Regions:
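Structured catalytic-domain cores with a bias toward divalent-metal coordination
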Residues: 1-144
Length: 144
């Protein structure tokens, strides 16, 4: 399929090329980096509290983190989402509405990561539910 997509894209009309979207909510480093960067630029100093509180949530140690620690990260991630929401006007003015939407979704992905990883026996069900939400988000915010 990938080869077919590459071949198709070589001759596809402008704007009709095929691509993939993705945002991995089972890992956190990329989402943290993006949302912290945008938040810090929009509201200097605002990201530091969350960088510290969510430092445990890193891709290198993901399999060594306890379910209890993930559960404790969920309220912090909820607060981060609220912080991004509170900075919406500043982020939109500085970077645009799509940057705000993506930063907010990165914050949600951090929450989802904690939720999925703390779920143990319900891992697949929780993950699949969040994946369905992510598909809906991309349908709303993507280019096709």
């Amino acid at each position: 399929m990938l080869q077919w997509m590459r071949t198709y894209n070589e001759t596809a009309p402008e704007g009709e090329d095929l691509n993939f979207y993705g945002m991995d909510m089972q890992w956190a480093d990329s989402s943290k980096e993006y949302v912290f960067d945008i938040l810090e630029q929009a509201v200097p100093g605002a990201a530091s509290e969350y960088e510290e509180a969510l430092a445990f949530l890193n891709d290198d140690d993901m399999y060594d983190i306890s379910t209890e620690t993930f559960a404790q990260g969920m309220p912090v991630a909820e607060k981060l989402i609220q912080e991004v929401d509170n900075a919406e006007a500043v982020i939109v003015e500085a970077f645009g509405s799509e940057t705000f939407a993506f930063a907010r979704e990165c914050a949600r992905s951090i929450y989802n990561c904690c939720d999925i990883r703390k779920s143990d026996s319900e891992y697949n069900e929780i993950r699949d539910g969040h994946m369905a939400e992510k598909v809906e988000w991309f349908l709303e915010h993507g280019d096709g």
